[in-house]
Amino acid sequence: MSTSIKAIKESLEAVTSLLDPLFQELATDTRSGVQKALKSRQKAIQAELAEEERLEAMLSYEKALYKKGYQAIAGIDEVGRGPLAGPVVAACVILPKYCKIKGLNDSKKIPKSKHETIYQAVKEKALAIGIGIIDNQLIDEVNIYEATKLAMLEAIKQLESQLTQPDYLLIDAMTLDIAISQQSILKGDANSLSIAAASIVAKVTRDQMMANYDRIFPGYGFAKNAGYGTKEHLQGLKAYGITPIHRKSFEPVKSMCCDSTNP
């Protein structure tokens, strides 16, 4: 009596290598259900191997620093440079050595449906997390570039009260005036797991803030557009005017402010 397809599927779930002899054994089973299960498991293993390879590549900066003796590497990234409303948010995250979190990537590449799950995984595994928030008023005062640096420095400062202190900083496309060894990495959130961890923390934190603002200031779509200049947001500006969280140094908000001051 041949093994049931259900039993074969259960056996395949335990297989983790494409070289497992079970694959060769099942290749001669002509049942369509078996062949479908076989191909499905092979595809899943290939995806798992590709993910492992991707994560390993994203640890290259960290591994090089571990070899040099650094122990607590902090990744730093920001979210919210471009929106017309809301703060710029930066995060500083120290992960355990060689830590890999499945699905962790540049937050812009992670499906929104998976943001919260990966965010929670980072929170659970991180040795330390700091968050810096610079509001729209200070952004208008100092410009968004300087505000981004201030947010990053604030995120680092938050680690002072935590057990693990960074001895090296990996920063997404930015150099900070601080007495800690550092490296600026172009597209760092896609090339360093530490920076990617900071990216998702900053992203989820800011999205939560903008969702709260959406309840306070309805009509602009902040929960969906996070303050970016979408059609709904621009229509809201025309219909209701600017809010206390809009950046007055950003167009078209800037022009609206000028128009309102002219007779």
Swiss-Prot record:
SUPFAM superfamilies: Ribonuclease H-like (SSF53098)
EC number of the protein: 3.1.26.4
Pfam family, one: RNase_HII
Keywords annotated in UniProt: Cytoplasm, Endonuclease, Hydrolase, Manganese, Metal-binding, Nuclease
Cofactor(s) the protein needs: Mn(2+); Mg(2+)
CC annotations in GO: cytoplasm; ribonuclease H2 complex
Residues noted as binding a divalent metal cation in the record, renumbered to the chain: 77-78, 172
Gene Ontology MF: a single term: RNA-DNA hybrid ribonuclease activity
Alphabetical list of InterPro entries matching this protein: RNase_HII (IPR022898), RNase_HII/HIII (IPR001352), RNase_HII/HIII_dom (IPR024567), RNaseH-like_sf (IPR012337), RNaseH_sf (IPR036397)
Function: Endonuclease that specifically degrades the RNA of RNA-DNA hybrids.
Name of this protein: Ribonuclease HII
